[in-house]
Amino acid sequence: MEDYGLPLVPEAIRRISDSADRKLAWQFFLMFSRFEYALKRQKYVRADRKDAQAAWKSFANDHAVKFSANHDPQLQRAIAYIKQAPPKKQIHENRVLDWAEPKHFSGGPLLPWLLDQVQIIRNNLFHGGKFPQFAVSDPSRDRELIESALVVLGHALRLNHDIEHRFLEGIDL
């Protein structure tokens, strides 16, 4: 990891940024952030907020019927993994960090539940939720969740041509 002239980048941060999973995390970051950009550009913006936040639930509800894993084994595996081992959500009570029990799929449209899980995976990764007091006991679980989330995002993107177009705009292919 380059230090870009920054004072004293801690060794722990250097180890994380130089890990084998760096590329996977970077791909997830790019995919998630471009998807949010595309949602907002296509007017999927939460009306209940002044700050521009992507309306993931609206998108998921609008496209839930079209979403299907029937003919894609990779998507089937990703969904099965997230259903089997959904991410925990970091919570706090009286300023003490803890983990909520995962929200398991209980029926109904699958896409809204899956995109909720993808957002939890993103929050855990990018807000440091996986390291509140100690390192994660099974990093491979995080890797599988991130890989599964990437597969779900890729398939969700193809549900709406306009969103897919916005996702790709300005990116030299």
Stretch-by-stretch model annotation:
Residues 1-117, 166-173:
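Amphipathic alpha-helical interface elements
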Residues 14-20, 134-143:
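Short helix/strand-bridging catalytic loops that position acidic/His residues to coordinate divalent metals
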Residues 28, 115-118, 139-142, 146:
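Hydrophobic packing residues in well-ordered alpha-helices of helical domains and bundles
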Residues 37-40, 44, 123-131, 154-165:
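Charged/polar positions within long, soluble alpha-helices
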Residues 111-134:
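Histidine-centered, metal-coordinating catalytic motifs and their short helical/loop contexts
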Residues 141-171:
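Amphipathic, Lys/Arg-enriched alpha-helical patches that create a basic surface
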